[in-house]
């Protein structure tokens, strides 16, 4: 039986249509950028765990988020081992670039909402069959805004997170096309993009 988790993506993404991804950064830099994201009004932060070293970074950002009541998730959770890392670091949810049924089920059983990557209608149907409500459209910059418009036809009830190649210059276009949330990374390091990101959070 799956563990009951008070968090769901409906709650995680309720306050802001933007998620921050902190990939491959040193611990102190990750905490700094997570804090910048929270100060902007971005509620949700993801730290990918592609190595054991990244687990320490995730744990530090989780601790910083706990002080503010902000959820921090583990990204690139593609194996059972990485799921174990996410659990040990205190992640609130897991994210993956693709859809792996075993990883998805294991994450849900561990009490962590799972956000799998999808790129086709077949992917969407498979993910929904596993009971996954929110889906990550990846890579969004390759799929393009028209992908979201097209998917609204057969899947009007599915909320998508546009991920991959999103920054302040194109985020609004993806939201207008039907993405419920956009995920940004390096944009947080660019002072010129911060005002535009802040504007997204006002709508």
Residue ranges and their predicted role:
Residues 1-92, 109-110, 157, 167-169, ...:
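Conserved N-terminal beta1-alpha1 strand-loop-helix module at the mouth
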Residues 93-106, 136-147, 177-197:
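Glycine-rich phosphate-binding active-site loops on the catalytic face of alpha/beta enzymes
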Residues 49, 76, 97-99, 118-120, ...:
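Short secondary-structure boundary segments
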Residues 39-41, 120-135:
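N-terminal/domain-start segments enriched in small and hydrophobic, helix-friendly residues
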């Amino acid at each position: 039986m799956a563990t009951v988790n008070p968090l769901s993506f409906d709650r995680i993404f309720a306050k802001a249509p933007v998620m921050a991804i902190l990939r491959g950064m040193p611990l102190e830099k990750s905490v700094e950028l997570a804090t910048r994201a929270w100060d902007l009004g971005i509620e949700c932060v993801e730290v990918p765990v592609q190595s054991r070293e990244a687990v320490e970074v995730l744990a530090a950002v989780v601790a910083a988020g706990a002080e503010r009541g902000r959820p921090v998730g583990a990204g690139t959770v593609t194996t059972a081992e990485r799921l174990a890392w996410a659990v040990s670091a205190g992640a609130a949810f897991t994210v993956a670039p693709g859809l792996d049924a075993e990883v998805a089920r294991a994450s849900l059983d561990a009490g962590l909402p799972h956000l799998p990557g999808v790129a086709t209608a077949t992917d969407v149907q498979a993910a929904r069959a596993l009971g996954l409500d929110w889906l990550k459209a990846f890579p969004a910059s390759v799929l393009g805004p028209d992908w979201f418009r097209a998917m609204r036809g057969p899947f009007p009830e599915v909320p998508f997170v546009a991920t991959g190649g999103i920054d302040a210059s194109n985020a609004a276009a993806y939201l207008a096309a039907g993405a419920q949330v956009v995920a940004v990374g390096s944009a947080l390091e660019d002072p010129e993009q911060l005002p535009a990101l802040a504007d997204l959070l006002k709508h």
